[in-house]
């Protein structure tokens, strides 16, 4: 069945363009990192952009086994998962395309026949903008020199996330067997949050409303928790995804590992499964992420820089907490004792 073009196609394109212009008029803040910032492994999108001038590709191969108990079918699915990300105009703004091209072989056990399908299962283009940066203040990125606990133990304030907004569209081109009768273009909106629970644990959440205005709109959520080991090149993650739609609903679990080969190159492996049997799903995927780093730090004119306050050298004028004050006093006492011990032999020698 040929894909239908919705009447609201011009409005959808105008909406995306207007949103991009709105974001481009907002103030920028550095999002660039020295190490590649990849959404792989897993499906969750982090709140942060790749950085202005950075071109990043994230690709992987996957295989999935689906068995449907009611339809009495078995399916083998294989394909390519690809995402292209570009830091556009601002440090906070990112242009994001993602697509999944897959082949599916369906065996109808009752009829003893087979069917083969192949096309884009996902084809999206959108923009993501970091609306609120929890660590915009550089003081929050600095370690507490007076308290080991403050640096390594979970604090409730760490749950306050950075927040990003995503707006884009799905594209169904030609006679796509996975979406018969689906409009050519349908909007997609998402809110992404990212919290640094501890220096090694990061929590990411996504809430998305997809295929808006179609016969099968879809709500979904993602919760992903990642952990970096003592060797920071290695990290693991666990992820929960929920999907609610008249076409398909399920709850999925994923878990895997990532390895940083170089600052611009990462490899990953993950597997997962669903909870339902209509269909049951078991899958495995492996991929890489690579970036072309053309980022350049912007020079801020001196007249645009913040003035230096009289207390800027003392925690930027911030009053120390009780715990920080106690830790500071203990550190000062230890330093005084150490100085007295060092000066005592010199006095005896005189």
Regions found by a protein language model. Give the residues of each.
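Functionally engaged cysteine thiol sites
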Residues: 7, 17, 52
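Glutamine-centric residue-chemistry signal
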Residues: 14, 29-31
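Transmembrane beta-barrel domains of Gram-negative outer membranes and organellar outer membranes
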Residues: 31-212, 216-258, 262-270, 275-350
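N-terminal secretory signal peptides that target proteins for export/translocation
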Residues: 1-12
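Sec-dependent signal peptide hydrophobic core
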Residues: 13-20
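Short stretches within intrinsically disordered, low-complexity N-terminal or propeptide regions
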Residues: 4-5, 20, 29
